[in-house]
C-alpha cells in the first residue's frame, strides 16, 4: 500500500494527510460521549440481513426465569454482527453490534443495543470504554429515568454510570432517542473507587439465597475471592438474628445505606432493594467489602412497584433485597436508613431544580423522538407529579 501511495498525485497525498489529521483531532473522550446539554448523533450502518437477524433475537420468558438460574447466570440469546458506527461525525469501523435487554425492554423495531468498539480492532475505544450501551427506554416513556437517576446517584456520592441522550439511526432510519449508559467496567470503577482490580458482579433477578451463589454474573476479577464473599453473605442472610455489625463486615454500610436510600427516594421499584434486580456488586480490594451500584434504572419515579402491587407497603423504603431486609429488621438499620434518606432530602432533592431539569430535557429531546415515543410529554407529567409529592 505504501508503494501505491507514492504513485498518487501530490494533491491526493495532501488531502489524505488532512483527513487523517482531522480524524485524529476529532478523537472522542468520555466527556464527548456523555454530554448533558445536547443529544448525541449515533449513526449505525449494518447489512440489512444482519440487522433483521439481531433485532428478532429474543429471550424466552420461561427459560429466563427458570430455576436453573440459581446455579448459573442466565445465558443471553444475542449474537454480535459486524457494523460501522459514527458518533457525532467520528467513524468507528467494523464494530460489534448486538441486541440487549432482559424481558421488558425487548423490541424488534427499536431494540436496545450493545456496540463493541474493539470487536475487530482490539485497540479501538473511547477513553478506556470499549463497549457502548444504548437503551431504548421502552419501559420508560418519560425517557428521563436513567439520565436523572444516575445523575442523582453520582451527585450524592454513590458510584453509578454516566448517562447521555442519543438519537440513534440504523441504515438511515431514525429509531428515536436512546439513553447512552456508561458500561460498568473500568471507567466507572476507577471513578467511583479509585481502582478496578476487584471482583465485579452483575445481579439480574438474583439475591443472596442459599444455593444461589453461582447465579451472580462475574464481569471482572478473581472468581474464588468473589464466590467466597457471596457465600459468607448468604450464610449471614440465612440467620434470622443477624446484626448490622455482622453485615458491615462484608458490605460497606456507609455506601450501602446511601445506595439503598437513593433507590427508595427515586421510587426505583425494579432495583436491588425493590426487586432484587438491576444492580452491580463490587468487591473493593481497599475495603474488602461489597459496594453496590445501580443498573437498568429505567423504572424510576413511581410510588409503588409494578410487580406485587401492595398498598400496605411503605413508600419511603424498599426491602425486597435480602441485605436491605435484614438491615431493616434491626433498630440500628432503621435509624441509619432514615438518616441517609433525610440527608438526601436536605442536600440533593431540590424540587424546583428537578422540575426545571424535566422542562430542559423535554425541550432537548423532543425534536429527535420516534413515533413510538409519542407518549413522552404525557408520561413526563407523572414524573413531575412524583417530584412535587
Language-model features: where?
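Bacterial N-terminal signal peptides
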Residues: 11-20
Amino acid at each position: 500500500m505504501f508503494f501505491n501511495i507514492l504513485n498518487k498525485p501530490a494533491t491526493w497525498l495532501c488531502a489524505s494527510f488532512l483527513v487523517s489529521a482531522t480524524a485524529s483531532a476529532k478523537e472522542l473522550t468520555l466527556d464527548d460521549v456523555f454530554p448533558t446539554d445536547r443529544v448525541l448523533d449515533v449513526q449505525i450502518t449494518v447489512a440489512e440481513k444482519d440487522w433483521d437477524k439481531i433485532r428478532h433475537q429474543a429471550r424466552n420468558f420461561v427459560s429466563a426465569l427458570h430455576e436453573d438460574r440459581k446455579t448459573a447466570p442466565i445465558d443471553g440469546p444475542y449474537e454480535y454482527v459486524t457494523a460501522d458506527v459514527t458518533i457525532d461525525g467520528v467513524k468507528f469501523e467494523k464494530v460489534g453490534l448486538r441486541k440487549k435487554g432482559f424481558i421488558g425492554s425487548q423490541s424488534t423495531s427499536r431494540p436496545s443495543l450493545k456496540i463493541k468498539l474493539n470487536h475487530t480492532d482490539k485497540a479501538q475505544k473511547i477513553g478506556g470504554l470499549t463497549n457502548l450501551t444504548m437503551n431504548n427506554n421502552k419501559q420508560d416513556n418519560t425517557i428521563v429515568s436513567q439520565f436523572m437517576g444516575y445523575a442523582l446517584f453520582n451527585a450524592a456520592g454513590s458510584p453509578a454510570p454516566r448517562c447521555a441522550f442519543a438519537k440513534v439511526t440504523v441504515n438511515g432510519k431514525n429509531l428515536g432517542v436512546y439513553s447512552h449508559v456508561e458500561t460498568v467496567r473500568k471507567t466507572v470503577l476507577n471513578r467511583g473507587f479509585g481502582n478496578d482490580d476487584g471482583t465485579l458482579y452483575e445481579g439480574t433477578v438474583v439475591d443472596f439465597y442459599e444455593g444461589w451463589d453461582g447465579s451472580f454474573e462475574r464481569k471482572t476479577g478473581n472468581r474464588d475471592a468473589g464466590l467466597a464473599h457471596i457465600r459468607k453473605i448468604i450464610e449471614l442472610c440465612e440467620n434470622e438474628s443477624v446484626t448490622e455489625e455482622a453485615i458491615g463486615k462484608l458490605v460497606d454500610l456507609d455506601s450501602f445505606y446511601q445506595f439503598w436510600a437513593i433507590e427508595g427516594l427515586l421510587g426505583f421499584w425494579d432495583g436491588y432493594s425493590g426487586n432484587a434486580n438491576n444492580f452491580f456488586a463490587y468487591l473493593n480490594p481497599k475495603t474488602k467489602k461489597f459496594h453496590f451500584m445501580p443498573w437498568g434504572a429505567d423504572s424510576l419515579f413511581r410510588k409503588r412497584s409494578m410487580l406485587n402491587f401492595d398498598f400496605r407497603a411503605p413508600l419511603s423504603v424498599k426491602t425486597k433485597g435480602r441485605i436491605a431486609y435484614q438491615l431493616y429488621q434491626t433498630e440500628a438499620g432503621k435509624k441509619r436508613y432514615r438518616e441517609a434518606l433525610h440527608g438526601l432530602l436536605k442536600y440533593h432533592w431540590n424540587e424546583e431544580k428537578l422540575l426545571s431539569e424535566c422542562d430542559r430535557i423535554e425541550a432537548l429531546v423532543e425534536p429527535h423522538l420516534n413515533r413510538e415515543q409519542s407518549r413522552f410529554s404525557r408520561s413526563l407529567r407523572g414524573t413531575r407529579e412524583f417530584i412535587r409529592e
